[in-house]
Amino acid sequence: EVKEILPSDVQVNTIVDQPEVVDMNLGHFFIEFGIAIAAVILVVMLLLPFRVATISAIAAPVTIAVTFAILNLLGIEMHQVSLAAMIIVLGMVVDDAIIVVDNYIEKVDEKIPSWTAAWQSATQLMVPIFTATLTIVLSFLPLAFTLTGLTREFVQWIPITVSIALAVSFLVALFLTPYMCYHFLKK
């Protein structure tokens, strides 16, 4: 379309095919994501039993999948910047779940019934987990609103993506993680 408007002595060539670059980066992201999940499982398995490590590790892919879905619903396209934001947040999305699982194990060790332990592990830690999540979100979010011009257009998706992923991580930790603990970690 552009070639029709331009004079005949002007050439238009494709330098970078953005969808191709994003597809390649998406592949790299999933490789890094797999490595991160394996590292989380390995580290947690050193400290906790296999089932506990598995529940903590499930939180990451669930959070990332829901984050991708929300980004899609909001019309935020997958591009290099949003992928970079997902890589930035990758290690953070399991933290909340690990804390809830650890608290659940403590409660069960104190002879509290499984259902009560699951409920208490989420409700007692809601404020501290929310505060920690909010602190991280508030450290990224100003980038979306304080920058102007081309810089804003380029960078604004990092804080938005990070904020969505951390909010999803918070919800997964408070709702899904205790439920999985109750069903899979009975003594």
Sequence positions of predicted segments:
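Juxtamembrane "pre-transmembrane" interface segments
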Residues: 1-42, 142, 149, 153
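Internal alpha-helical transmembrane segments of multi-pass membrane proteins, especially GPCRs
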Residues: 26-34, 58, 83-86, 122, ...
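Hydrophobic transmembrane alpha-helices and their membrane-interface caps
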Residues: 39-46, 50-106, 164
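Transmembrane alpha-helices and their membrane-interface boundaries in multi-pass membrane transporters
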Residues: 90, 94-104, 126-145, 154-187
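Residue-level signature of catalytic and energy-coupling elements of molecular machines
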Residues: 25, 40, 57, 61, ...
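Short helix-loop junctions at transmembrane helix boundaries
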Residues: 18, 68-84, 144-162
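Helix-loop junctions and hydrophobic alpha-helical segments within the transmembrane domains
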Residues: 15, 22, 26, 101, ...
